[in-house]
UniProtKB/Swiss-Prot annotation:
The lineage of its organism: Bacteria, Pseudomonadati, Aquificota, Aquificia, Aquificales. Pfam families: MotA_ExbB. MotA and MotB comprise the stator element of the flagellar motor complex. Required for rotation of the flagellar motor. Probable transmembrane proton channel. The keyword Transport applies. InterPro entries: Flag_MotA_CS, MotA-like, MotA_ExbB_proton_chnl. Keywords: Cell membrane, Chemotaxis, Flagellar rotation, Hydrogen ion transport, Ion transport, Membrane, Transmembrane, Transmembrane helix, Transport. This is Motility protein A. The chain crosses the membrane at residues 6-26, 32-52, 150-170, 184-204. GO terms for biological process: bacterial-type flagellum-dependent swarming motility; chemotaxis; proton transmembrane transport. It comes from Aquifex aeolicus (strain VF5).
Length: 254
C-alpha cells in the first residue's frame, strides 16, 4: 500500500478544518442542501456520462487509489533476466516448473510463459497478450475518466448551488439583514465543490492514472521481453532494455 494518497487527502481536509475552526464556528460551514446539490448532483451527472456498469466500477476503483502498491521495478527487471538466462541455458521447457510463480508476479506474464511452454507461436502469444493489455488499458482508463469527470462536476454543481442560493437571497431584498447570511449560505456550495474536486476527486484520479500507466508499462515490457527471449537474444541485453524502459539504472557490471 502506498500511504501517500491517504496522508495527502486526510492532511488536506484537516488543514481546511483547522482553518475554519481558527476563523470561527464550523456550524456556519454546514449546509445539508448544499451537500445534496454538490455530491448528489455531481454523482448523478457523472452516472449519466457513462454506462452504469462502467460508472459503478469507476467509483469502486477508489479502493485502488488507497490500496494500490507500486510494482518493484528492480524485481521486474530481475524476473526478466532470470527468465532469459534460464531459457538460454536450459531451453523454454525449463520454465514449466515456475509457471505458478510467474502468475503470482503478473497474471499476463504467467499466461505468456504458459503459452510459450505449450509451444504456441510467438506471434500468437504476442497478439493475445496485446489484446488482453488493450482491454486492461481501456478498463483502467474508464476508471480514471469517472474520477476526472467527478472532479469537473463537483465545482460545476457547487456553482449551480450558489446560483440557486443567490436567487433565493435576491427574493428577500426587502430584508437587508438577511443578505449577509444568505450570501454566506449561497457560497458554501461553491466551497464544497472546490474542496471535493481538489482535495479528493483529483488526487484519486491522478493516483488511478499513475496505477494504470505503471501497469500498462510493466506489462508492455513483459510482452516485449518474452518476444526477445523466445528469439534467443542475449539475457543481459534484454534485461538492460527493460531497465531503460523503466528508468532504472543497473549496476555497471551488468
Amino acid at each position: 500500500m502506498d500511504v501517500g494518497t491517504i496522508i495527502g487527502i486526510i492532511a488536506a481536509f484537516l488543514l481546511i478544518l483547522i482553518s475554519i475552526l481558527i476563523g470561527g464556528s464550523i456550524t456556519a460551514f454546514i449546509n445539508v442542501p448544499s451537500i445534496f446539490i454538490v455530491v448528489g448532483g455531481g454523482m448523478a451527472a457523472a452516472m449519466g456520462a457513462f454506462p452504469l456498469k462502467d460508472f459503478i466500477r469507476g467509483v469502486l476503483a477508489i479502493k485502488k487509489a488507497f490500496l494500490w502498491k507500486p510494482p518493484d521495478l528492480n524485481d521486474v527487471i530481475e524476473t526478466i533476466g532470470e527468465i532469459a538466462s534460464k531459457v538460454r541455458k536450459e531451453g523454454i521447457l525449463a520454465l514449466e516448473g515456475d509457471i505458478e510463480l510467474y502468475y503470482q508476479k503478473d497474471p499476463l506474464l504467467g499466461d505468456m510463459i504458459r503459452m510459450l511452454v505449450d509451444g504456441i507461436d510467438i506471434n500468437d502469444i504476442k497478439a493475445t497478450a496485446e489484446m488482453a493489455l488493450a482491454q486492461l488499458d481501456e478498463k483502467m482508463s474508464t476508471e480514471v475518466a469517472v474520477w476526472e469527470k467527478l472532479a469537473d462536476l463537483f465545482p460545476a454543481f457547487g456553482m449551480i448551488g450558489t446560483l440557486i442560493g443567490l436567487i433565493q437571497m435576491l427574493r428577500n431584498l426587502n430584508d437587508p439583514s438577511a443578505l449577509g447570511p444568505g450570501m454566506a449560505v449561497a457560497l458554501i456550495t461553491t466551497l464544497y465543490g472546490a474542496i471535493l474536486a481538489n482535495a479528493f476527486a483529483i488526487p484519486v484520479a491522478n493516483k488511478l492514472k499513475k496505477a494504470k500507466d505503471m501497469e500498462v508499462l510493466v506489462k508492455t515490457i513483459y510482452i516485449e521481453a518474452i518476444e526477445k527471449i523466445q528469439k534467443g537474444e542475449n539475457p543481459n541485453v534484454v534485461k538492460q532494455e527493460a531497465a531503460i524502459m523503466l528508468g532504472v539504472e543497473l549496476p555497471e557490471e551488468v
